């Protein structure tokens, strides 16, 4: 079995893959254009940010699994992979700690004027800050928009800094908030009003909703801090640039959008660059050795489970619930041809099988099988299955 690795991985990880009995094609500089040629007889494809196009999917006749070394799967033609019966898996949240650490680094830099002081000292200028320019984080209130793995890592660090934490998320309940020692907010604007600092993290696949709009910003306290990491589409940049000046907000951001606005000279441009004391960085969020190692460990786990157990962990393109409306529940003799005969009767009845599951009992004499169907079998088909040699029992259940 061939594994094509189209991203940088340590030699130890490549050796682990080879120890699973695979032939590893290591092409860390592989482009999307060349991938189409190399993927033809590959069973497993590993990528980081390289585009996996519909053409690559079509060319991968032997392709069974695509693994994204990271969380964001926007670079993979998911619909086409699903149509060809190819599993797509990722390594979710292995970057959560790294993103939380950067978020706090940006908060501290905003509060203490780290960049300004470092720049002045580099020029030989001893620039002593005014008393009160840095407020300190202890005892302040942090509003966390969202409550996924990244935000929960931010909360852990906030508590270590003796910061009061508020949180809002569509999925957050008062009970979960209490268990996490944060105060529940029913609405984003409530969080904005009550916070001295606000953090926002938005991965690429969730960037279709603006979380920080003009209304949210107008509700923030004068002089508050806002740090956002991830895709910039989650923040109304024009509103932030305008309101930050009016309300003296301090802004820091790390952006990771694949296509960013540039000037005619090819340089990045943003309304936020002109804001006093604004801090902007590009794709620092997950770039730590700890995050890299966590991702490679998870990548190995995904491929190992697939090769050894036939199970795809972290799969992102399976239906949570199949379109099946009926289920056959059978006890069968564990002998050659019994299940095949059952399937033959289902086919003869013109019914499609959506899912099938089978288990064998101790002694390997009998098995238990469930077959999910897209419509109800005819009475004649059920009778024919019951009469098959090796069928011990049959029950038909409606799926609701």
Where are these regions (language model features)?
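A conserved regulatory-domain signal marking ACT and ACT-like small-molecule sensing domains
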Residues: 313-400
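Rossmann-like dinucleotide-binding domain for NAD(H)/NADP(H)
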Residues: 88, 222-324, 332-333, 368, ...
